């Protein structure tokens, strides 16, 4: 199910607690090299994406920047239509180091500001998020980073950040998919007005085969792909999603989620797939240096 060029107006915005709004569907660029990411971002922009999710740790910010510049989305009126996220390397957490790292990211991206700057991992075993957040606030106050977020923060991390800074992030980006729904984390975020953003929204494709054909049966009923079913489930949950694809046709498919809706029974069947199936890393122990 694809309609060629997707009207960006079809993709809803999620209102954030800081007054900004983020397109609910974006393109993730993890594990794409610096040269390869250029045509990937260019094709996504052509398909109608208005949200690009990157990170310093992906080692491709320069390529993303070249794609934005080549497409005219790095400045002017077109820039104002685009949401660009990047993330701080864990090794550069801290007040002065975060400010320096941000300047480098901005230069590589060829931008005057980013729409969201995020702490990539909480590293509770080497907690520096409090000082880092103070640097983030300076960047926000200076108009350099419009929204501040975190990734992979568990409730204990969010509580600690709030206790030590008085602030809740606007967004928490976590691993989230049908077989790893993290309901406790999601509930905590909703309680405190934190928008939830899902990376690996399909468990890197593994969830397509979950539940003895559950996803495939729903896809057949709607004449869409299994991937679209999973992404539609996220949309109906109010989750921001950043599926990755290097293929233009798949990028279009991943954006084409608004011509069908799941029934209550179908949605419940996907809810029932929840289980202990993490596709990524444990935030209690992992660092993305």
Feature-to-residue mapping (PLM):
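CE4/NodB-like, metal-dependent polysaccharide N-deacetylase domain
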Residues: 98-119, 138-142, 164
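A short, structured active-site edge motif that brings together acidic residues
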Residues: 78-92, 115-122, 176
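N-terminal binding-site loop/beta-alpha segment at the start of enzyme catalytic domains
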Residues: 1-82, 202-203, 269, 286-289
């Amino acid at each position: 199910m694809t309609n060629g060029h997707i009207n960006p107006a079809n993709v809803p915005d999620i209102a954030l607690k800081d007054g900004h709004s983020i397109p609910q569907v974006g393109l993730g660029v993890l594990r794409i090299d610096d040269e390869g990411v250029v045509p990937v971002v260019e094709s996504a922009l052509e398909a109608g994406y208005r949200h690009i999710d990157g990170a310093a740790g992906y080692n491709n910010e320069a390529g993303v920047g070249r794609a934005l510049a080549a497409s005219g989305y790095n400045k002017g009126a077109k820039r104002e239509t685009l949401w660009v996220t990047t993330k701080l390397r864990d090794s550069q957490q801290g007040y002065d180091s975060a400010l320096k790292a941000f300047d480098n990211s901005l230069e590589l991206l060829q931008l005057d500001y980013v729409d969201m700057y995020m702490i990539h991992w909480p590293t509770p075993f080497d907690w520096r998020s409090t000082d880092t957040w103070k640097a983030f606030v300076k960047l926000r106050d200076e108009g350099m980073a419009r929204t501040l977020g975190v990734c992979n923060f568990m409730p204990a991390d969010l509580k600690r950040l709030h206790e030590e800074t008085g602030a809740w992030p606007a967004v928490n980006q976590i691993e989230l998919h049908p077989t790893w729904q993290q309901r406790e984390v999601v509930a905590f975020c909703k309680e405190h007005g934190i928008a939830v953003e899902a990376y690996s929204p399909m468990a890197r494709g593994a969830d397509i085969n979950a539940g003895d054909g559950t996803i495939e049966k729903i896809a057949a009923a709607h004449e869409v792909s299994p991937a679209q079913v999973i992404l539609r489930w996220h949309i109906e949950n109010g989750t921001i999603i950043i599926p990755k694809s290097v293929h233009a046709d798949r990028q279009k498919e991943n954006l084409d989620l608004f011509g069908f809706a799941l029934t209550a029974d179908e949605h419940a069947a996907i809810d029932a797939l929840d289980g202990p199936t993490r596709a990524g890393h444990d935030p209690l122990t992992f660092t993305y240096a």
